[in-house]
Amino acid sequence: KSQSPNLNRLALIRRHITSNICLNTKYTSTRSDDDVVIIDAIRTPMCKANRGSLKDANPECMIETVLRETLKRNKLEAKTIQEIIFGNVMMTGAGLYQTRMAQFLADFPCETTVMTVNRLCSSGLQAVMDVANQIATNQIDIGIAGGVESMSQYSMNDGLAPEKLSDSIFENEGARNCLIPMGLTSENVCEKYGLKREDLDQFA
């Protein structure tokens, strides 16, 4: 079945940001003892920023909940988890301390290593890729990946006040464009490439 021009364009963009191995059906349609698999997916409830019953919930407590539930649902011992990686963008230190604290709150041993990654708008996905790559290269056998953010406790505008930025940022188009909010960026991308919401939903 042929795809619409917009979906073809989305497929092209996908190839720019994903591994060729991920797109090769030779690797995805057959099973192998070397496959890296995701055995579960767990998330906490969500609420809008500064609203709802979770607006005062600490990120480390939310991570702890996910870690404990992961062990419980899959009948795993904490000591079998060799790596925990969480993505984060807004928190101080990119969530390093919160993830480490959550590890101990959930009764994981100190031998389980912890790392946080900061990649705007896809930090959680980057964490999943990092754990998968460690498994694929035989660095670890099992790990947990995720993402955490509290828009109620950490403002997107922290540190972006014009008076806090160097003048050189406003003299460089690429650097200046980094200040464009993601909502406007998505609108600009859709307009530039003629993408419609229906096509994006179908592709997703």
Language model segments and positions:
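Acyl-thioester C-C bond-transforming condensing/cleaving domain
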Residues: 8-14, 18-36, 47-80, 95-97, ...
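Residue-level detector of conserved, well-ordered beta-strand and adjacent loop positions
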Residues: 39-40, 87, 118
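Short polar catalytic/cofactor-binding loops
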Residues: 41-46
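Short glycine-rich phosphate-binding loop at a beta-alpha junction
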Residues: 80-87
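Glycine-rich phosphate-binding loops at beta-strand->alpha-helix junctions
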Residues: 88-94
